[in-house]
């Protein structure tokens, strides 16, 4: 079993550790406008970044991305869960994860 880097938690208590793009798609698809209105993805230890997806009253989703180490805070809206999960997966891949081994480049 690999190291845990981050988790996705929904308002209704569902949790997925290190969620794949497909797992994020399922969690966002399960959102509704009454009792499961958001999903938050962040590292468990010392969360210096997070992403959230929330249902909008007028339809669609609000996506918030915050990374304190890079002084970034973006808020967007979207309607396509496919686009949201793809963009979040790419964005999360560029984040710093406490405890994750650093990449080393070696010349041969």
Which ranges hold each PLM region?
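Acidic, proline/glycine-rich low-complexity IDRs
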Residues: 1-108
């Amino acid at each position: 079993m690999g190291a845990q880097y981050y988790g996705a938690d929904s308002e209704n208590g569902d949790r997925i550790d290190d969620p794949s793009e497909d797992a994020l798609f399922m969690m966002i698809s399960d959102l509704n406008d009454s009792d499961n209105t958001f999903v938050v993805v962040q590292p468990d230890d010392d969360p210096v970044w997070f992403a959230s997806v929330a249902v909008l009253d007028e339809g669609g989703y609000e996506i918030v991305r915050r990374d304190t180490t890079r002084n970034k805070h973006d808020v967007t809206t979207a309607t396509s869960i496919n686009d949201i999960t793809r963009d979040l997966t790419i964005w999360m891949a560029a984040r710093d994860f406490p405890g994750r081994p650093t990449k080393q480049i070696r010349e041969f």
